[in-house]
């Protein structure tokens, strides 16, 4: 852009830097550019401002009033603020709109006015110069100074070529001149694609079949290579054969659109080709080259590819194509005659280091657009995090998108007015309404008082808005690595941002949180807690899942419930768990339902039950319930998931499992646990029983699963049988759910120790675990309590106490019955139920 600046415009930039140094500012903002324009003194901008009574001293004093002096003089290079960069971009647009091939002082001033939000615009308004009036003055003076400023242009504009009107009427209608866009500075810089650009130049310089086609994955920079070629042509960095060439991109959609009758499309395409032949200096760029095949071929008409083939073969038409690997294979390779006319140029995905260099090259454009400052750490984070966590897209596109959205996010946050300004607006509106009511009531004394209040509020609001605009908006906001991580977290649901103090505390207390739902099972709770902490601290193996466990042990001891509790801890919802019942996959052919049916089979387009869910929620807990019931082929498919953290679905897409926790539950080796010690509870030799069961479970797992499957599992956890104390604690949890339902009816529920003990005795089975406990509570407590509520024996405002008759606490309790007594809740203790017996709104029970 700076090569288009006139000598006076360049002098303005130098003077702006000097003004920044004088004010001890370590940046060049719009205010310094304005000072430079006035200080220059001879250009159209200076004359325009002088005619409006704007002096250098007046502007300086206003700048010092709004911003003030800096602490110390800056050393070395002083950078432009994003807003100042935006002004310089706008000056180029103003020059192009006026048909000038140079950027003079007047264009910089017009850019300042068009930007309209910086300190410079505030200063002009404060000094009584309306922005529209300043613009009119510049345009008026331009008529007298245009010839003089053009003489200053020097090397700017490359001899005025960009100012000449285009003669390519048809091409301008159906395409876009990339060389003109490059000359006007509208194209982003191209970083590190020298080899690809050189290869394209070599193919274009051939005598025949001089048509390169850029092949690469979406988002790797195929179009950027062509834009780089256009910039090389503009800068003269091409061989003699390509000098003075014009690079046009053809829009096939525009060619086809509106062609209602047979022959319309062919006629348009022939006109384009005729114009290219007449000009002789046109290189055609067709993005999405595969759209040539079949384009316009309705009702028997020949398609665009067939029309272009003869000219491509004879070298009469030079074309650059771009398409993806899949589309090239699907469309171009099938048409051998078309394929041989194009020479493939592979465009690979850049490395993370190369992507960082690309982002640094684009930084100025995004800073100017979003009016923020983007740190080096943000660019490194964008490249590395995008490469690690966004697996279905390619660099540098996904990293650029992260930077772009983070900048947009920061700008939106800063441009939102503070809440106190909205409060002022509400108070002013209220004062006006009250004033009008007072006038209608002819209470003029009150109306005068309200008028004064309104004026005071308006003045206070104006002062607060001035502070906001001159303070917050002129402090350049920074986009750093933390904001990049937050944007990525919003995209993928993977929490990669830094741990807050609250989350750190919560993670350290994770076992305690899980034990609110899980009774006992210390080993299992510790294992999953460590896996989650490892992931959030960033220390897990980046190529494997966050954790993989086999939960083995008797039925009904909390294996599935722990998985649900973990999902609830991470996402706040039990439904966040991806639960796969492996009993549905006992046949070999049912494996395709998990990963997606192969082509040609029913359900191919739908995707797999597992792969689709994980693809949409990559940070999740996946539970494979009762894994031993699945077919052996499924275990083979899961080996790659456990080792490499990825799996290819039926449609060839790679699904990332690196941020999932994989849990397999199994009941293997526990079928003979039916002879407990004592009355259904583990006592005395319980630890020996557990070790015996653990050994048997491990032996059964080794028999059932292949060694390569078990070897990839992080930990095999054998759950304990439940003890008497744990069953009684489960009673408390389950009763809390019933009490929570009663609380909505203004009732409370209290169970005596005897009632809890009898429920535990009747509800526990050594084979089925604690699952029967839920049915026992439903039968003995909920059913009887519902009848008493319907018979109005108990009601709102009462505490229902459940006790036991005919049981001494030791025997089998076959004749024991539960009794329900309703008493009025004391007024002083409205939360008696909560204090007395685990009443209100506890978590879901863990009797599984």
Curated annotation (Swiss-Prot):
SUPFAM superfamilies found in the cross-reference section: Double Clp-N motif (SSF81923), P-loop containing nucleoside triphosphate hydrolases (SSF52540)
Region (Disordered): 821-848
Source organism, top-level taxon: Bacteria
Keyword Cytoplasm attributed: no
An example Gene Ontology CC term for this record: cytoplasm
InterPro entries (UniProt xref): AAA+_ATPase, ATPase_AAA_core, Clp_ATPase_C, Clp_N_dom_sf, Clp_R_dom, ClpA/B, ClpA/B_CS1, ClpA/ClpB_AAA_lid
Record domain UVR: where: 425-460
Statement: the UniProt record of this protein carries the keyword Repeat: yes
Region of interest: Repeat 1: 5-70
Region (II): 479-670
Residue numbers binding ATP: 216-223, 553-560
One Gene Ontology term of the molecular function aspect: ATP binding
PANTHER family tied to this protein: ATP-DEPENDENT CLP PROTEASE, HEAT SHOCK PROTEIN 104
Function description: ATP-dependent specificity component of the Clp protease. It directs the protease to specific substrates. Can perform chaperone functions in the absence of ClpP.
Entry protein name: ATP-dependent Clp protease ATP-binding subunit ClpC1
Organism: Mycobacterium tuberculosis (strain CDC 1551 / Oshkosh)
Originating gene: clpC1
